[in-house]
Amino acid sequence: MRTKTIGLLSAAVLLLCLLTGCGKTGDRVRVAVITKATNSDFWHGVQSGVEAAASAYAADVTFTGPDSEEDYAAQNALIRQAVEDGADAIVLSAIDRQRNAAAVDEAAARGVKIVSIDSAVDSDAVALFIGTDDRAAGRAAGEAAVAGFVSPAEIRIGLVNIAKETANGAEREQGLRDYLSGVPNAKIIAVEHAENTLADATAAAVRLLREYPQINVLIGFNEWMTLGVGAAIRDADAAARVRAVGFDANVVSVAMLETGEMDALIVQDPYAIGYLGVRYAVALAGGEQAPAQPVHTTVATADRTNMFDKDMQKLLFRF
């Protein structure tokens, strides 16, 4: 009789485990955040937001990215590994909007919810995009570029951008071009595409200044491109003749803004991007519907006239 009772108890416990998931961490949602890299202040800001949301929403969250922001194949491997590791949702900033699409589609086919942050991917499986309105940010860069000139002065612009295949760089450049179409005295002279390293971005900016001496505006389209633009202007002692506009904020670029190598920074909110990415990933994994429209985070233009304003300090001095 004792043996039979124990057997019945064991069967009951086994059934309870099957129904409730013994061995799992409660009902915690598993979220894999996969960014383009992890080695810049921008991504550190995203990670801070991710970690805060993981705590707030009691989620099991991993944060990974390739060593290089050009290595889409490594990013695809991380996507596939996240699926094998049992992720309920993936939050992705895509390196290549086309070459990352197949891995995203495969993950979605396995039931994983997909949230896109910062840089989009060409996949219908994406439930929601969260990040900067990059067209609007590009227009803001155009406005900042021409602000230092009195019409009809000739404005000759050089661009230092990231890879053509990366969605946010392409969108920012298009927004800039849209804005400049209404400025008849402004013209883009040349575009350089650089890898996401200080050395490569600086070399690209130096080439523009050397090969096109008529350039009087340089624009860098992300954190690394901005640092390269600032370094090239500093090394050429060109701050008095070349207006510089960049994206993002770290201790170096903010110092360049204060000392004059940079004239304006288009500042994003990476903390909010990371936080909201996890917040919506948890909601989607729990069966909630995604918002009908993209969730756009704050973007602001900082210059020497407003960089110490209270609201701007929150964006500029998060490092």
Each language-model region and where it sits:
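Hinge/cleft segment of the Venus flytrap/periplasmic-binding protein
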Residues: 160, 164, 168, 179-180, ...
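Hydrophobic alpha-helical segments within soluble ligand-binding/sensing domains
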Residues: 75, 130-155, 171, 200-202, ...
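Bacterial signal peptide processing site
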Residues: 23-25
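Flexible loop/hinge segments that line or gate small-molecule binding clefts
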Residues: 97-136, 147, 156, 250-263, ...
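C-terminal motif of bacterial Sec signal peptides marking the signal peptidase cleavage site
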Residues: 17-21
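Extracytoplasmic "Venus flytrap"
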Residues: 32-49, 53, 57, 62-76, ...
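Short, solvent-exposed amphipathic alpha-helices that sit
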Residues: 42-56, 137-144, 167-186, 200, ...
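Hydrophobic alpha-helical
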Residues: 80-83, 88-108, 176, 194-256
